[in-house]
Amino acid sequence: MTDKLTSLRQITTVVADTGDIAAMKLYQPQDATTNPSIILNAAQIPEYRKLIDEAITWAREQSSDHAQQIVDATDKLAVNIGLEILKLIPGRISTEVDARLSYDTVASVAKAKRLIKLYNEAGISNDRILIKLASTWQGIRAAEQLEKEGINCNLTLLFSFAQARACAEAGVFLISPFVGRILDWYKANGDQKEFAPSEDPGVVSVTEIYQYYKKHGYKTVVMGASFRNLGEIIELAGCDRLTIAPSLLKELAESEGPVERKLAYTGEIQAKPAPLTEAEFYWQHNQDPMAVDKLADGIRKFAIDQGKLEKMISDLL
């Protein structure tokens, strides 16, 4: 009998949410996603020590200023880890822009181009890279500009329908709505502690976004992310892509039985609405207390891990 991971691959592109080379070799995903937390964890893996040393040596050659060396080495390390992962996957690597730039469009564009330049100098073309940006209004505007310049983006930390709609209207390549973190919020802030997979608030959110995109003919890829259990993944089978942590990839691979398509749109394509204005975006996003909390929390957490990574680099310089 076929295992659930093999079955899922027939209807959804499976992406690995990790920087672990061993997991890449084992589960052979199409694409891979990283973020500051994943890079920080990957930096502890012994096989990656040479990538850290190489990034530090390179940074010393770029500048004599210690603060600039930290920035350069951190960027280079993220790209070095991405390069190692690209050797193991046929598709794309997602590399994230510093979360502390989430409300600065100009700085986000500059950082994205810096990361792309480092990949290009290593012989990697733009069609194998996705630049990850937080789904703030400023991040979405940065992505809109980058897409026009041939740099595809992955808009992350997406929790509200307003964020999803603004991303589609900006023509971004891909969004990563966070299923599990939505569930976390409802469990922590409501009376209900258990949800059937089909009623899981994160699953409901991604389903709504998927149906809206397909109904209006938006090309933006929907990639569900941040899963807490197998039920969420099975309930979103048919989503364009799903990025899954190694522990859940393992669980899927060890579970037998078919996975049935749950997401599909069979209706007619309807006209797109007028794009959200900045004021409309903020008003609609702020009507969702979960999304407001989780976006801010996600940015803070990624910024903390970015700081830890820089501290580790600083101590080695």
UniProtKB/Swiss-Prot annotation:
Task: Give the metabolic or biological pathway.
Answer: Carbohydrate degradation; pentose phosphate pathway; D-glyceraldehyde 3-phosphate and beta-D-fructose 6-phosphate from D-ribose 5-phosphate and D-xylulose 5-phosphate (non-oxidative stage): step 2/3
Q: Which Gene3D superfamilies does this UniProt record tie to the protein?
A: Aldolase class I
Quote the subcellular location field of this record: Cytoplasm
Can you list the GO cellular component terms from the UniProt entry? cytosol
Q: Which UniProt keywords apply?
A: Cytoplasm, Pentose shunt, Schiff base, Transferase
Q: Which GO terms describe its biological process?
A: carbohydrate metabolic process; pentose-phosphate shunt
Annotated GO molecular function terms are: transaldolase activity
What enzyme class is recorded for this protein?
transferase
Which residues constitute the catalytic centre?
K132
Q: Entry's CDD domains?
A: Transaldolase_TalAB
Report the NCBIfam families cross-referenced here. Answer: PRK12346.1 (NF009001), talAB (TIGR00874)
Protein known as: Transaldolase
Q: Which organism is it from?
A: Yersinia pseudotuberculosis serotype O:3 (strain YPIII)
